[in-house]
Amino acid sequence: SKIIGDNEALFLSQLDQISWLVNCRGFHLPYQSIFLARMVALKEQALIFVPEGIPIEPKLQNHPFLTFIYVKSGGTLQQLVTLRKNHQIDRIFYSKSSVTAEDYHYLSTVFNERILTPQENMVADVAAKKSETEIVLFKEAFARANQAIFKTIKDVIRRFECEERVSEQDFYNQTNTNYSDGGAITQSFKTISAVGKNSSIIHFGQPSSKNIISDGDLLLLDSGAYYKNGFATDTTRTFIAGEPAPWQREIYTLVLKGLLQAQNAVFPVGTWGASIDALARTPMQRLGYDYAHGTGHGIGVNAHEAGYSISPKSNRPLVEGSIGSIEPGIYLPQKGGVRLENIVLVEAHPKFSGMLHFVPLTCIGFEPKLIDYKMLTSEEQVMLVDYEELCRKQGTSFTWS
């Protein structure tokens, strides 16, 4: 009822939005908690069309507001015909950017152009602002994920220091095992475990059993998981095997400065993500570095969600209650790269009316050996100490471990 009015309907094919709107999960596709479906939402009822053979829990079969209907291939058309006969529909909304050609054919066959109404982000804008219950669930998921990542880094470094042969594939496997041991159902995307020069590849995805961790290698871990509540986690940390070179400390510290500046921003309601993006890039740009990706994306049922964006092109405001990433990086081809990613919650500032700030959900300490403290301003040093104290309380600070 927050999205559509009387005699209106909304056709949805975006699986994460369907899963969020009806608060159901299926884990039907790799690295996702969604279920396969199409959906028509009315003001007080949702009709969910699912492929035959997909199990539906008994408690959902007699739900007062959700009606699950099994359909064969092409069966969506017949369900739309039935919908048209049984309900007075003056307008049916759909997303022009995501509807498939097949689904649009069905819609345009049943509804004329006057009724069929393209409209973007009707669900995404509502889903972006998390409820108090959802925020609690996110905090619970990240508390588990933080421990899994911290344990992985400790395990890998311990094995390396004990002179074990630890490969990129071992690094990958160790990460996924630690998530599973902590109660994760699956990963929220394929784990990125990059060793040495592979850390300079932004979305590295081919861990090798032949790439053995060596002294001086940068190790980049970008990973996430789903727990029972079905919301995604996503965090990146970069650390070092052995002792770092000066160039490694420089790029790590510049990335850290950008993360600290962005994460500690205080900004007016209505501020666009582009303003925060500039804060993250400025420290490295002063020394000639930059990165070819956005600084932040939303997170929800999927690891990437609309409604929250931090990039040079972000032209929408950051809203209270939204959750997303801050993830600056520097990547030097054939040498190595650094990315640091925290997931944050946008909250009203506790002291300043009309202002917002970020609260980190990711609480995993930074690599002390890679920080050049002389490069940090006094303000950034305070920011770092405050963040490490949060991590220390969760047992996830390398500074105090």
Annotate the PLM regions:
Residues S1-S401:
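Active-site neighborhoods and metal-handling regions in enzymes and metal-associated proteins
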